[in-house]
Amino acid sequence: MKIAVLPGDGIGTEIVAEAVKVLNALDLKLEMETALVGGAAYEAFGHPLPDATLKLAKEADAVLFGAVGDWKYDKLDRPLRPEQAILGLRKNLGLFANFRPAICYEQLVDASSLKPELIAGLDILIIRELTGDIYFGQPRGRRTATDGHFPGAEEAFDTMRYSRPEIERIAHVAFQAARKRSKRVTSVDKANVLETFQFWRDVLTEVGQQYPDVELDHMYVDNAAMQLVRAPKKFDVVVTGNLFGDILSDEAAMLTGSIGMLPSASLNASSQGLYEPSHGSAPDIAGKGVANPLATILSAAMMLRFSLNQEVAAQRIEAAVKDVLVQGLRTADIFSTGTTRVSTVEMGAAVVKALK
């Protein structure tokens, strides 16, 4: 089982190091090779995704990714910015399905900004289509307007589009995931305004007929955003497009009290995947030893489950994370009165010790 380890920038190196320690403690036959990506790769090779890094990722069974980005690269040409590395990996590996779980651990209920009764026991899985929608639709650009409200004015434009195969494959992923949970799927769209998402709704409904044991309901994105705050536990599996998924998954993440707790997975058709924490590179706290490694450690658990077929090992990691929370150990982002504040390295060591 070959893993490409890409720590990246900022706190990425710190949190990935702890996840690697946890993986090494499992006594599995894992072959892990590390490479530069993002700003670190730009500094060394002049590009955020060097050919050698991409080759390593393509040949691996899975990629364990930290985070990329730093304010000092914001003035670079867009293709050279660190964030382009993750887009390049998604494209070259064909990663079309993004899994973003939002789980509220019992010990962290008070960390949420919502009332405890609203989020206690929360367990949502947001499945976001990653390769289509307005982020990648063509044409796009800037031009002089020839019509609209202000002909002759400078304007910018993007294209929202989805093909039937793109929608069908993400729909199957969602229904199959729901079968392993509570057999409920909520498809989020804007079918009342956008032709693209009326088509999305039609195709989801058609695919849903192949899964008579799974309940499907549709919800407009504005209502979904509201219901995530009003009654989040009404959701189980949520499937949506790239743009809406980008927004809703971050909203759901904050329901739990800390984005530092939330893993993510991006998979292709052959279950090769890229696994990363939901948070960014946080250059403001890099090197201070205060970053929360649990999202990355839980991402490693997802990697074992979805790409490496190691369910027992995945459960061991998840149980160990719960154990350290029960012990009252907290990094700065989830620290509260009555708990014990620990560093990044100390939290990683505690998870290793808690493995059973």
Curated annotation (Swiss-Prot):
Gene Ontology process terms (BP): L-leucine biosynthetic process
Family of this protein: Belongs to the isocitrate and isopropylmalate dehydrogenases family. LeuB type 1 subfamily.
Q: What class of enzyme is it?
A: oxidoreductase
Where in the cell? Cytoplasm
Described by its record, this protein's role is as follows: Catalyzes the oxidation of 3-carboxy-2-hydroxy-4-methylpentanoate (3-isopropylmalate) to 3-carboxy-4-methyl-2-oxopentanoate. The product decarboxylates to 4-methyl-2 oxopentanoate.
Give UniProt keywords alphabetically. Answer: Amino-acid biosynthesis, Branched-chain amino acid biosynthesis, Cytoplasm, Leucine biosynthesis, Magnesium, Manganese, Metal-binding, NAD, Oxidoreductase
Please give the subunit comment from the record. Answer: Homodimer.
The protein's GO terms of the molecular function aspect are:
3-isopropylmalate dehydrogenase activity; magnesium ion binding; NAD binding
Q: Does the keyword Methyltransferase apply?
A: no
Show the PANTHER family listed in the entry: 3-ISOPROPYLMALATE DEHYDROGENASE
Q: Where is this site: Important for catalysis?
A: 135, 190
Residues annotated to bind NAD(+): 280-292
Q: Which residues bind Mg(2+)?
A: 222, 246, 250
- InterPro entries in alphabetical order: IsoCit/isopropylmalate_DH_CS, IsoPropMal-DH-like_dom, Isopropylmalate_DH
- List, alphabetically, the PROSITE patterns matched: IDH_IMDH (PS00470)
Q: Which cofactor does it need?
A: Mg(2+); Mn(2+)
Any Pfam family from its record, for instance, is Iso_dh
Q: Where does substrate bind?
A: 90, 100, 128, 222
Protein name as it appears in the record: 3-isopropylmalate dehydrogenase
**A GO term from the CC aspect:** cytosol
EC numbers on record: 1.1.1.85
